């Protein structure tokens, strides 16, 4: 456990009233085989009231975002009892309401340390079930993800015009992994993938990681209650305002914490995802895929996925064993998108990798 901090200055930051250290709390559970691979679960340790510049008024932030922080601590309590191949980080990020400063600082730190981040699960508001729209729902939740990394090359961007992949970036694959894990292990829940970086025009602490090319998503409640969000505690015209603990549903928070736990455990136990995944098959009645293989003691085999180009989820799959290439006979490349994952002997599976290279 350690503190990671950066000095944020008032100059140039309209939401910062004075120079201050933005301090994150970071706890690392080291992996046994791949300690430099990290899956991160984050909550936020800051809050705000109606006026973001008012740092003296009470701003309990029970749902936004004590719930995310409580989830990270509870996940650490549960998962720390197990050993994983990859490392897990549980982190409390600061300065989110003032400009995503904590996430930006940790993302820079990760870059400087050469961390290989497998994914960031940003939990920001995971405890409210009663929306301002009148809906009460304790089973659904949202998974926000950007389509492709902003750091991708111009060559990759041009290539996508001809070969596809507009909705298949690394963060979108991470979102699909969360969706699939939930459907498999928590079928009572209804995960909603939202094809958007975050809520309309808004931001969260996964974005600074996305900005530098790391996969990251936001996990949160489906129905927000704006009367309880960024509000001074008060009563107006019979309406209660303020983010207090009475607005938190602990059973729901527990469910979304479990979603994080099964996602992190799945990734942290699984083999590393395939690398150099390539595809070919133009004007042929079959699709060819290839990838770099891991040593036999690190992986049991590989699984090829495909889906209709309009489908949000991977709907078809075939386990092909411990091979480095495979041809799907009778599957025309034009009609589907494809991906490859790595699987261990216990069935733990990596995030699916979309091909970014061509077989000539």
Where are these regions (language model features)?
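Short beta-strand segments within Ig-like beta-sandwich modules, predominantly Fibronectin type-III
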Residues: 316-323
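Beta-strand-rich modules
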Residues: 328-350
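Alpha-helical metal-binding/catalytic segments enriched in His/Glu/Asp
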Residues: 27, 41, 46-47, 52-100, ...
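Conserved aromatic anchor
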Residues: 285-298
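Short beta-strand elements bearing conserved aromatic residues within extracellular beta-rich modules
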Residues: 301-304
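A non-catalytic alpha/beta surface segment that caps or lines the substrate-entry region
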Residues: 1-30
């Amino acid at each position: 456990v350690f503190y990671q901090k950066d000095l944020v200055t008032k100059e140039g930051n309209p939401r910062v009233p004075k120079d201050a250290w933005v301090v994150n709390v970071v706890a690392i559970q080291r992996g046994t085989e791949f300690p430099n691979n990290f899956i991160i679960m984050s909550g936020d340790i800051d809050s705000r009231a109606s006026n973001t510049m008012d740092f003296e008024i009470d701003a309990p932030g029970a749902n936004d975002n004590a719930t995310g922080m409580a989830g990270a601590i509870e996940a650490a309590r549960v998962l720390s009892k197990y050993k994983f191949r990859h490392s897990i980080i549980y982190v409390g990020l600061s300065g989110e309401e003032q400009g995503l400063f904590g996430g930006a600082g940790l993302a820079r730190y990760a870059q400087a340390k050469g961390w290989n981040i497998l994914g960031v699960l940003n939990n920001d508001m995971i405890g409210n079930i009663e929306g301002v729209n009148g809906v009460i729902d304790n089973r659904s939740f949202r998974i926000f993800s950007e389509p492709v990394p902003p750091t991708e090359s111009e060559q990759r961007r041009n290539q996508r015009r001809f070969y596809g992949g507009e909705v298949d970036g690394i963060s979108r694959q991470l979102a699909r992994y969360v969706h699939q894990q939930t459907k498999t292990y928590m079928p009572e829940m209804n995960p909603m993938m939202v094809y958007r970086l975050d809520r309309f025009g808004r931001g969260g602490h996964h974005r600074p990681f996305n900005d530098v090319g790391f996969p990251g998503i936001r996990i949160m409640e489906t129905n927000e209650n704006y009367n309880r969000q960024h509000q001074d505690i008060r009563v107006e015209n019979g309406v209660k305002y303020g983010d207090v603990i009475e607005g938190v549903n602990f059973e729901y928070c527990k469910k979304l914490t479990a979603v994080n736990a099964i996602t992190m455990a799945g990734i942290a136990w699984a083999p590393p995802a395939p690398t150099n995944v390539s595809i070919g098959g133009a004007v042929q009645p079959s699709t060819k895929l290839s990838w770099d293989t891991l040593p036999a003691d690190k992986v049991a085999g590989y699984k090829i996925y495909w889906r209709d180009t309009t489908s949000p989820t991977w709907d078809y799959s075939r386990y092909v064993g411990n091979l480095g290439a495979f041809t799907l006979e009778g599957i025309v490349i034009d009609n589907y998108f494809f991906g490859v994952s790595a699987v261990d002997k216990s069935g733990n599976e990596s995030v699916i990798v979309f091909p970014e290279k061509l077989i000539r």
